[in-house]
Every structure is written in C-alpha cells, then in structure tokens.
C-alpha cells in the first residue's frame, strides 16, 4: 500500500480543514447577502465542456479512463455556465449563482512526470447582464468578500485589471502569425521576444510603450485615450475605476490597469482581473475572474442571455497567506469520561450521552484506568480539559 499521497495531492490536518471551512463560510455569507444562490456543479464533466470551446488546453485537464471522454474540472465556470443554459435556462435574468468545491489541475513536474494539483475554490457567476453593469456589481461584491478576509498591510493586496478589447486595439496593425507572436510576447512581458521579431522601429517602440503602460488606472486610461481616441472599452473602464477607487482605498488595495494582462485560461472576452497578495515567499493570486460571454454562447445562450461574468477565490492559498491572522476556533471545552476497575465501558458510554444531551463535547477513555490520577494524566493527550471520573 502506498503511504504517500499522489503527486500534487495534500493531506490536510484538522486545523487546516477548520480554517478552510471558516473562510468558505465567511465568503458564502457575503454571497447570500448579495442575493446569490448556491449550486453544486459536478466534479466529473465531459471533456468538451471542460475545454470551454478551446479556451482551456487539454494538458490542463485531468482525464479519466472511461467509455466516453471525461475529466476532472480544472475550474467551475464552464460547468456552471452549462447548467445556467440548460437546467436553469427558464430562470429569470439576472441569474446569480455561487459555488464552492474542489478543482483539479494537471501540470508537468520539473522531472517531467504528471502532477495533479487539488485546490479548494469558492466563487460567484452572474448571467444575463451586459457590460458595464454586471462588472460594477461583480467588483463591488469582490471588495465586500475581500473585506471579510481581513487582509493586512503586509500582504500588499493589488487588483490587477485588464480588458481583451485593449489587447485587440494594440494588435490592430498586425496580422496572422506575427499577431500571435506579438501577443504572446506582450502577455509574458518578454522584451527579447519582441526584439527577435525585427519589427520596424516605430512599431517596436510603440509596442514597448504598451509593455510599460501599466500602473494607476486613470493615468493609464488617459494615455490610452491619447493613442486610440474615444473607445467604449475605455469609457467603461473609466466608469468602473471611478466606482472601485474609494472601495479599494478603504481596504488598502492598490489598483493597477495593464492593457497587456491576459490570464492563463483564455475564457475571457472582456474585463479580466486578478487579486494578488504578497506572501512571505512570493506573490500569490488569491482571486481571479472576468467576463466570458463567448463561453455562455457556446453553451447555447442567445442574445442578452449570452452574457456572463464571475470570479473565484483560491481558499487553500488564502489559508496559507492568513495563517498568522486567522486562527482556528478557540479550543472547545471537552470532557474526558474515564472509568476505573469498578465501572464499565457501558457506564461510561451512558455518561457520555448525558453530556451530549447538554450540548457538551465529551469523549470516552475506552480502556479502564488504574485510578483517578491515571485518568487525569491522560487529559492532555486526549485533548480534553475536564475529567468525569466513574469508579462504581
């Protein structure tokens, strides 16, 4: 029998499980306050659904051996979008849903072997609302949810925002393969890759300008307006940041607009964002989301119903980030019911039921103790604070 978990999998101890539950419950309370209903998408889906119309690469999905192509979900948005367009099709829009559960991501380890990463996720999806109203609610909800996490200044939280329309504007002068190479270089902030393309000097300098055009949102928008003129995407972002700025300031969250920012999964067709915090070792992404209208359309939605936005929190990463700030519940007083040679286990179990009826946590010492002192010495090992001694 293998004594180690599979590569990428983790055994969580009781405290880690409790902290995950506490974080999930905090977020769930916020979702409910905002009128979101809980759903539970399946862990196993058809590969066609999980790939989200090509937005998620096959190598990111853990495949199952089955009669039909199946896999474990690498995220929950595609499954919830499918449900919204089928089982929940007749429900009125806006359709507000939230879910929490485990996701599974496949990656290649340094030595070349397959590694499966298992993570707990919690998030919301909002269907049937066009820009920019949906984004206004979504990011306002994000800030409300983040507030319950009680991030501190040492985490240096930063909300990085992009928009696929901004990348489209940058890519307008370029065609075909060159367009994709430039896009990849910009996304990865790879100046050397841009140089290797041997572009005309004016185009190269303009791309370098875009590469460095990131920072305070309103300043960046002003620079982009000077380059591209009046654009609906810029107007929407202007309105959105005017709404977000005071919310972010209240929580000490830095806002950053980056026209070249694009996430790993190519789900998004509009606003994209991720919330980054500084851990003791390195930056960590604790939330991400955006607009994914194309995905909803692929699920069969038409017209206004083909609209969706959402975000998700990475619970395990948040737990590790907040280990010093958030603690497990104060130790619950636990009674150890112990018995001596003159009593029996049956008596102890009956006594335990007495405590349980009063709502008191109690455990039974399953072997008889020599005397009261022997029973008392076992309190610490059993995680108990009081002793109920039976000797007759």
Curated annotation (Swiss-Prot):
GO MF annotation: an example: histidine-tRNA ligase activity
Pfam families: tRNA-synt_His
Main location group: cytoplasm
Subcellular localization(s) per the UniProt record: Cytoplasm
InterPro entries: aa-tRNA-synth_II (IPR006195), aa-tRNA-synth_II/BPL/LPL (IPR045864), HisRS-like_core (IPR041715), HisRS/HisZ (IPR004516), HisZ (IPR004517)
GO cellular component, one term: cytoplasm
Keyword Amino-acid biosynthesis: yes
Keywords, alphabetical: Amino-acid biosynthesis, Cytoplasm, Histidine biosynthesis
PANTHER family linked: HISTIDINE--TRNA LIGASE, MITOCHONDRIAL-RELATED, HISTIDYL-TRNA SYNTHETASE
HAMAP family assigned: HisZ
Family: Belongs to the class-II aminoacyl-tRNA synthetase family. HisZ subfamily.
Name by which UniProt lists this protein: ATP phosphoribosyltransferase regulatory subunit
Taxonomic lineage: Bacteria, Bacillati, Cyanobacteriota, Cyanophyceae, Synechococcales
Gene this chain is encoded by: hisZ
């Amino acid at each position: 029998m293998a004594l180690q978990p599979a590569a990428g999998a983790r055994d969580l101890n009781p405290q880690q499980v409790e902290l995950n539950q506490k974080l999930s419950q905090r977020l769930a309370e916020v979702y409910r306050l905002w009128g979101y209903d809980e759903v539970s998408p399946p862990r196993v889906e058809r590969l066609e659904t999980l790939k989200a119309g090509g937005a998620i690469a096959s190598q990111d999905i853990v495949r199952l051996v089955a009669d039909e192509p199946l896999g474990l979900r690498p995220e929950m948005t595609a499954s919830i979008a499918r449900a919204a367009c089928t089982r929940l099709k007749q429900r009125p829009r806006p359709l507000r849903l939230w879910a929490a559960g485990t996701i599974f991501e496949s990656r290649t380890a340094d030595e070349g072997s397959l590694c499966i990463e298992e993570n707990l996720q919690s998030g919301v999806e909002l269907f049937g609302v066009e820009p920019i109203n949906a984004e206004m609610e979504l990011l306002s909800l994000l800030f409300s949810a983040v507030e319950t996490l009680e991030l501190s200044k040492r985490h240096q939280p930063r909300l990085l925002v992009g928009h696929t329309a901004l990348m489209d504007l940058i890519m307008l002068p370029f065609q075909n393969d060159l367009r994709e190479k430039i896009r990849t270089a910009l996304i990865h902030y790879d100046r050397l890759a841009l140089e290797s393309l041997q572009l005309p000097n004016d185009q190269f300098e303009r791309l370098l300008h875009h590469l460095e055009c990131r920072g305070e949102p309103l300043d960046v928008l002003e620079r982009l307006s000077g380059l591209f003129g009046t654009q609906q995407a810029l107007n929407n972002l202007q309105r959105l940041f005017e709404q977000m700025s005071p919310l972010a300031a209240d929580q000490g969250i830095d806002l950053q607009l980056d026209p070249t920012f694009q996430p790993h999964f190519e789900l998004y067709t509009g606003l994209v964002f991720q919330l980054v915090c500084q851990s003791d070792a390195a930056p960590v992404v604790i939330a991400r989301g955006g607009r994914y209208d194309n995905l909803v359309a692929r699920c069969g939605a038409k017209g206004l119903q083909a609209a969706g936005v959402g975000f998700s929190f990475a619970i395990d990463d948040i737990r590790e980030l907040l280990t010093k700030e958030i603690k497990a519940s104060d130790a619950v007083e636990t009674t150890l019911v112990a018995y001596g040679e003159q009593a029996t286990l049956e008596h102890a179990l009956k006594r335990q039921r007495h405590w349980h009826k009063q709502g008191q946590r109690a455990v039974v010492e399953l072997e008889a103790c020599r005397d009261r002192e022997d029973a008392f010495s076992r309190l610490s090992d059993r995680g108990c604070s009081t002793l109920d001694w039976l000797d007759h």
